[in-house]
Amino acid sequence: MTDLQSIAPRDKAEILAQALPYIRKFHGKTIVIKYGGNAMTDPALQADFAEDVVLLKLVGMNPVVVHGGGPQIETALKRLGKQGHFIQGMRVTDAETMEVVEWVLAGEVQQDIVGLINQAGGKAVGLTGRDGGLIRARKLKMVDKDDPSKEHDIGQVGDIVSIDPSVVKALQDDAFIPVISPLGFGEENESYNINADVVASKLATVLKAEKLMMLTNIPGVLNKSGALIPELTAREIDELVVDGTISGGMLPKIAGAIDAAKSGVNAVHIVDGRVPHAMLLEILTEQAYGTMIRSH
């Protein structure tokens, strides 16, 4: 793993020189970042992430952070004696779990991220789907992947109806960094827990983002031998889903990546969030730290 603090000054200068063309290329562009995995729970990686986001803003890009919070939600549920349950990579969310999800995501995780970014010199503002009517949602209908005639009731898990990016754009124009919790609201003002990968993908599409970066706990998409696949098309991904290579929690992440790529996001990267500054190195150098998804 590459740690920028361990790099010699001359090598750092070369990295900065390499970064200049990318800074020019992506100046003024929106970069949507799905922040999750170890990068959210390791204090050193948290600090690295905040610094990277601030640096992207300072060099003229517009980072938008969409965060997860699975481990933190799981910890809170265990404290309450409640067992988490997943179906096809989605958390089953009853009314009691929904209260925990809202409290953990908007009241704990989001505020921690906002604080870290502000501490690193940025101006972060926390949002949920309710703020400015950002994310309207409805109850997700989950069809069984093996039996299409069967549906699973997974509670207050939301399917995005629409995204109004006005509040995000207003914050960007005023030099703020939006930090978004994946919570939506329905017609009756009910709350919905929405998969953060899906929110990041849809938001990247609506904002016409240059890149969608998905930080995760693995090197990227791996083949059955455990080797990294550096680049994939939508068709190749379909084959990996059918043969079981891609499964579980990776399914919504991959579905979101394909959706964004097909909807006009120029580049979608699933990045190894365990590597210090991996996101920054992925954007500003020729080095790759994950899998790039393209539509064809």
Swiss-Prot record:
A Gene Ontology biological process term: arginine biosynthetic process via ornithine
InterPro entries given in the database record: AceGlu_kinase-like_sf, AcgluKinase_fam, ArgB, Asp/Glu/Uridylate_kinase, Glu/AcGlu_kinase, NAGK-C
A GO term for molecular function: acetylglutamate kinase activity
GO cellular component, one term: cytoplasm
Entry keyword ATP-binding: yes
Superkingdom assignment: Bacteria
Localisation per UniProt entry: Cytoplasm
EC category: transferase
Keywords: Amino-acid biosynthesis, Arginine biosynthesis, ATP-binding, Cytoplasm, Kinase, Nucleotide-binding, Transferase
SUPFAM superfamilies noted in UniProt: Carbamate kinase-like (SSF53633)
One Pfam family here: AA_kinase
Annotated residues for binding of substrate: G69, G70, R91, N193
Record flagged with keyword Cytoplasm: yes
Reactions this protein catalyses: N-acetyl-L-glutamate + ATP = N-acetyl-L-glutamyl 5-phosphate + ADP
CDD domains, per database record: AAK_NAGK-C
Pathway: Amino-acid biosynthesis; L-arginine biosynthesis; N(2)-acetyl-L-ornithine from L-glutamate: step 2/4
Marked site (Transition state stabilizer) residue numbers: K34, K253
Record family assignment: Belongs to the acetylglutamate kinase family. ArgB subfamily.
Function text: Catalyzes the ATP-dependent phosphorylation of N-acetyl-L-glutamate.
Protein name per the record: Acetylglutamate kinase
Name of the gene encoding the protein in the UniProt record: argB
